[in-house]
Amino acid sequence: MQNLKQITEQARAALDELHDKGIEALENFRVEYFGKKGHFTQLMQGLRDVLPEERPAMGAKINEAKQTVLEILNAKKEQIEQAALNVKLEQERIDVSLPGRKVEAGGLHPVSITIGRVTKFFSELGFSVESGPEIESDYYNFDALNIPKHHPARADHDTFWFNPELLLRTQTSGVQIRTMEKKQPPIRIMAPGRVYRNDYDQTHTPMFHQIELLYVDKNANFTELKGLLHDFLRAFFEEDLQVRFRPSYFPFTEPSAEVDVMGKNGKWLEVLGCGMVHPNVLRNVGIDPNEYSGFAVGMGVERLTMLRYNVTDLRSFFENDLRFLKQFK
C-alpha cells in the first residue's frame, strides 16, 4: 500500500509539471503509468502475490488511485488541446469579404437545345409531343409504313435486329402509327426521340435523334405543308433563307419531297424530308383516305444542329468533350 501511495503522489506531481507541456508529453506520461509496463499496470499484476482474502480490497484501492490519476490526465489533456486551439484561432483570420469559390453552371447539350427549339415552335401551332418504344416491331417500323419486304432499309447492314420481328427503331415513324391507332383525326403530333442505324462516319452515328411531325385532317394539303416548313426553317435559322422542295421518294408518303436551304457558300443543303401521308398508311390504321389526308415531316436533329452552329463532324456531339460543349452555353 505504501508503494501505491508513493506512485500516486509521483503521478500527481508529474502531471503538475506538465501544465505547459504539449500533448506528446502527456502521451509519454500515459505510457509510463498506464502502458503495458506502466506503474499502475505492475501494481495490478502484483495482486497475484497478495493473500486471496486481501486481493479485493487491494484491487479496489489500486483502481481508485488509477481512476483519480486518469481523470487528472484527461482534464490536463483537454486543457492543453483547448489552449492550442485558442492559439490557432487567434493566428487564423478569415476575411469574410473575400469572394467565394465560383460555381460553374452547366448547360444544355446542343442536341437538347435543338429539340427544345423545334418542339417549342410546333407546340405553339398546336402540335403535341408523343413518344414510343425504342425497341420496335417490324410491323410498326416497316410494314405499317408501306415499306416493302425487299426494301434495303430492312437489311442487316442498315438495321440492328434482335430477331426477325424485333429491332432498334430506325425512325420515330412508329409513334405516328401507334398514335393514329389510338386517336381519331384531327391529329397533330410531333415525335422526338433516339433512332438507330448501322452507320458511323463524319455525318452518321449508330444512334442519333429524329423529330417527326404528323398532321391528319380533312383537306390537309401540300400547300399547308410548304408554308409550315418555310416558316419553321426561317424561324429556326433566324434568317430569311431560300428554301426549295425537291421531288423525292419515301414509301410512306406520296408525293414526297426533300427540303433544301441555301447555305452561305451558295450551295443547297438538305435539311429534312416530307410528303403527304400515303393512302396505304392511313388504311393500315383504319383511317379512310377518301375522307382524310395528312402530311408528315422527318428531320435529323444532329443535322439541323450542325447546320445551325456550323459543326463539321456529327460525332462531336457524342464525344463528351467539354471544350466543344461549353461553346453552346
UniProtKB/Swiss-Prot annotation:
> Would the keyword Metal-binding be found if you checked this record's keyword annotation?
yes
Residues forming coiled coils: none
Cofactor note from UniProt?
A: Binds 2 magnesium ions per tetramer.
Provide one Gene Ontology cellular component.
cytoplasm
Enzyme class (EC, first level): ligase
Q: Which InterPro entries match?
A: aa-tRNA-synth_II (IPR006195), aa-tRNA-synth_II/BPL/LPL (IPR045864), Phe-tRNA-synth_IIc_asu (IPR004529), Phe-tRNA_ligase_II_N (IPR004188), Phe_tRNA_ligase_alpha1_bac (IPR022911), Phenylalanyl-tRNA_Synthase (IPR002319), tRNA-bd_arm (IPR010978)
Query: Mind telling me which PANTHER family this protein's record contains?
Result: PHENYLALANINE--TRNA LIGASE, MITOCHONDRIAL, PHENYLALANYL-TRNA SYNTHETASE
Q: Which residues bind Mg(2+)?
A: E254
Q: Example GO molecular function term? A: ATP binding
Say which family it is in: Belongs to the class-II aminoacyl-tRNA synthetase family. Phe-tRNA synthetase alpha subunit type 1 subfamily.
| Assembly information from the UniProt record | Tetramer of two alpha and two beta subunits.
Q: What is this protein called?
A: Phenylalanine--tRNA ligase alpha subunit
User: Whose protein is this, by species?
Assistant: Actinobacillus succinogenes (strain ATCC 55618 / DSM 22257 / CCUG 43843 / 130Z)
- Enzyme Commission no: 6.1.1.20
Name the cofactor(s) required for activity, per the record.
Mg(2+)
The reactions it catalyses are: tRNA(Phe) + L-phenylalanine + ATP = L-phenylalanyl-tRNA(Phe) + AMP + diphosphate + H(+)
Task: Indicate whether Transmembrane helix appears among the record's keywords.
Answer: no
A single GO BP term for this record reads: phenylalanyl-tRNA aminoacylation
The record's subcellular location field reads:
Cytoplasm
A Pfam family cross-referenced in the UniProt record is: tRNA-synt_2d
Q: What Gene3D superfamilies would the database entry show?
A: Bira Bifunctional Protein, Domain 2 (3.30.930.10)
